[in-house]
Amino acid sequence: MKTLVVLCTLLSIIFASPLSLKSPLVDDFYNPPRGYESAKLGEILKLRKTPGKISSLFIPVEVKNSWQLLVRSEDSFGNAAAIVTTVIEPFNADPSKVVSYQSWEDAANIECSPSYGMQFGAPLSSVQTQVDMIFIVPLLDKGCFVVLPDYEGPKSTFGVGRQSGKATLDSIKAVLKTKDFSGINDDAQVAMWGYSGGTIAAGWAATLQPKYAQELKKNLIGAALGGFVINITATAEATDGTLFAGLIPNALNGLANEFPDFKKRMYEVVEKRYEGALQQGTQHCLGGAILHFAFDQVFTGDHRYFEQGYGLLEEEVFNRTISGNSLLYMGQEYLPDIPIFVYHGSLDGIVPIPDVHGVYKNWCDWGIDSFEFAEDSLNGYLTEIVVGAPAAITWLDARFDGQPVVEGCKKTTRITDFSYPNISDSTRNFFKGILDSLTASQLGPGVTSDNVTLSGLTGFMGGLSKFKKSV
């Protein structure tokens, strides 16, 4: 009976007309007030409850509160900027625990911002944020406040490291000033977590923090980075002409949104017949880009967008911009001052692991205090998203519990990251989180929910599949 209720509810949601949410393009909340430039970094410029309910897989989830903050930040050049960050409070939240989750937005379009895409009623184009919300549910179920910054900022600068890192740090500064309405302690422990494109933000935040946000040293307890993106060129080479070729035009346009000289040169040298195709990289969120650009050859083949191919990346403006936003090429002054946990699949065909080995060697040679590297020999990019998540959650739990971190550097290669030590509870909570999101259960420690069983859910999914085939 429970399964039938869930099935009927889900079907009504799937086939109902989407709720009306204002796009960031027309929502005045995203526009900073006059004179905001004089505000301090991390200062809250505007505050509101999220217009729509938080949702996962386009199904509302029950949390106690959620807010959006407009926060003073800056771009790569130090120019004033205002970014939106979302704060989610679960039931029975622990005001001393905050996780800053950097979603894998991977788009050069502000309508792909997490603050918009995580709400019930968001368009189907926001599917990547809705899927990413699955990984946030277990954190909420553990009582952590979760913060999701629109780290690409108002210009949608996908791939731009400093913009993303600064926005992440400024959003954390802002959240630690919300005690009056959120209850979050100003001395709360804060951890960062991101996968793939989210590691551009979390990774750069970790490297910028010692100089850009020294005051956060007492709060930050570590960063978990999965599918660690540290070399934009390597990802372009790995994905050109593949199913994930859409990452390339999205990233090129994200860089162009921040660097005018890069944009000017890029559109000067693109083959005229492909100029419109390249511009489409500003129109699609990640899911749409994968579909639209599937198997396109941007740098290779007879129908490549750029006649020079990869040789174009050696031009001064291209080389300077791309290498300047790749952590692989950053010097010792970018060494993180907080514990780092990296989990990565050996078979990753989108974010190749050799460059991650390079960053591991560099940071360890330079004397990083704590760097734990979990390499999964059985999994690649897509499967490690799920397989590595319980390891990340386990590592985050240990940080919040005050357990000792790795001293210096430690790299372990396992057949699967499911065998990461002490992962059993985390695995159960992770998959329970997925179940809770599907059944719209109240989230928070100690909350009793009327959930369907796992076998019931399996049957429900099978029934849904048959239903869709019959209509």
Curated annotation (Swiss-Prot):
Disulfide bonds: C112-C285, C364-C409
Catalytic activity: a triacylglycerol + H2O = a diacylglycerol + a fatty acid + H(+)
Residues carrying a glycan: N231, N319, N422, N451
GO BP annotations, alphabetical order: lipid catabolic process
Its EC number(s): 3.1.1.3
Domain of life assignment: Eukaryota
Any one GO CC term of the record: extracellular region
Keyword field: Disulfide bond, Glycoprotein, Hydrolase, Lipid degradation, Lipid metabolism, Secreted, Signal, Virulence
Residues forming the catalytic site: S196, D348
Record's note on what induces expression: Expression is induced during biofilm formation. Expression is induced in medium containing Tween 40 as the sole source of carbon. Expression is up-regulated during the yeast-to-hyphal transition. During host infection, expressed in gastric tissues, but not in infected oral tissues.
Signal peptide positions (record): 1-16
Family annotation (InterPro entries): AB_hydrolase_fold, Lipase_secreted
GO terms of molecular function: triacylglycerol lipase activity
Protein location: Secreted
Primary role: Lipase that is able to hydrolyze both the neutral triacylglycerols and the monopalmitate ester Tween 40, allowing the use of hydrolyzed products as carbon sources. Has broad lipolytic activity, which may be important for colonization and subsequent infection, therefore contributing to the persistence and virulence in human tissue.
Entry's family note: Belongs to the AB hydrolase superfamily. Lipase family. Class Lip subfamily.
PANTHER family xref list: LIPASE 5, PTHR34853
Name of the molecule in the record: Lipase 3
